């Protein structure tokens, strides 16, 4: 399962870690997708909520994927479930206009 952490960026906000867990110990930076309560209904969003460890219904915003310093990651607060992985894949494909 992909972890959801609090990241200390412009302010503390939840993020979904996209970098593979296998390489995390060897990296100084990690790629994350921010999680926001602003739901636009876009194909680049993945719905998450309390079951994922997020306090409110929110979305993973794949239009705003960024790479941050690993030290900016705070505590793990939840996970994206395996059943949500196909939705994440589709959202990333849409965000980067990739063919399936």
Regions found by a protein language model. Name each.
Residues 1-100:
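Conserved functional hotspots at enzyme active or ligand-binding sites that engage polyanionic ligands
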């Amino acid at each position: 399962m992909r972890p959801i952490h609090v990241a200390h960026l412009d302010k503390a906000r939840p993020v979904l870690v996209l970098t593979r867990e296998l390489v995390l110990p060897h990296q100084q930076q990690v790629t994350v997708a921010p999680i926001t309560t602003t739901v636009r209904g876009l194909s680049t969003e993945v719905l998450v909520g309390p079951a994922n460890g997020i306090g409110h219904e929110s979305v993973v915003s794949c239009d705003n994927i960024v790479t941050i310093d690993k030290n900016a990651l705070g505590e793990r607060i939840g996970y994206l479930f395996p059943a949500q992985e196909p939705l994440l894949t589709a959202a990333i494909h849409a965000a980067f206009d990739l063919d399936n």
